[in-house]
C-alpha cells in the first residue's frame, strides 16, 4: 500500500501524529450571552480532560443545537478480542506501528505513554472526534456529549432518556463488530421513536463498512485488494447495532461493502460528491463539494422500491481501476448520504452518512467544515 494512501486512511480515522498533542476542550462554563439575545459561540480552551463522572444536562436554548454522539460498541469486548484471530477485530496499536514503520516510532506512541493493544486503536477513534466536537461547539454554543454503549469500565448505557432528554441531534456510530452482538432493544427503539416526535430533532446513523460478507474466499480477496488497507482483515463486518436500529425505525437501508472512492489523478484528492441538490430542500449540502477520503466506505443500499421513502442526496464515484464485486456488477458510484425528511408522527429528520465524515483530523477543508456547520444549523 502506498504511503499516501495509508496516511489518508490514518487521517480519516485520526491516526495522525497530532492526536497525542494537547487538544482543545470545550468549556461550557465559559460561555456568555451578549446583549440582544444572540447566542455566543462556545469558548474553547485547553482545560483538563475529565473521566468517570456523570453527564451534566445541557439547557435548551433556541438556535443552539445539543449534539450527542453514541458509540454503539462494547468497548471491553472489542479491546479484549483474541489477537490471534485474523478477522472481525480492530488492529492493535502495535500492528499499526508495524505497518507504518517508522511513522509511529515516537515517544508519544511508546508503551509508557500510549496503549499498545486494541484499546489504543479505540482511543485513537475517540481522539479523532475532538475536531468535530470543537467545531460544532463553536457553532452551537453547546458542548458535544459523547457516550458509549458499554464503556471501558464495563458500564452499560442503552439509548434512553438519560441521553435523549438533552439532545437535539443524536449521532449513532456503528463501529461495533457484528460478532460482539450489539442489538437495539425494543425499549431503545421506542425511546428513539418518542425522541423523533419532538419537533427539530435529528437522528444521524453512521454504520461503517461490511467487508468480506461473502463466503467466497476469492471474493473476499478481491475486496481486500480493492480497498488496499493492510490493517483491514479479509472479513470485517461492522454495524449490527445500527442495522437493528434501522430495522426497528423503518429505515430501509443496509450498509454493504467497503469501497474505495475515486480520486483526481493530478492531485490524488477525492473526486467531487455527486450531489442531488434538487432533492436537498433543506440545504444539507450547501457549500459542500466533497467529503473526506477513506479507502473503505460503505454503500448504503436502499432496500425499498418506494421512491418517497428516502432521498439519496449524495453519491460517490468508486475507484474503477481495481476490481470489486460491486463494480463488476456494473456499479460506478455508491450511496454516501441519504435523508428521510419528517413524515407523519415522526417530526425529526433521519440522516445516513458514514461515521468517518466526523472522526477525522483531516477535516480542515472548507467543504467538510460547511457540512458540519449545515448539520448544526439546518435541522
Predicted regions and their residues:
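Short, surface-exposed patches at the edges or C-terminal ends of soluble domains, predominantly
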Residues: 26-379
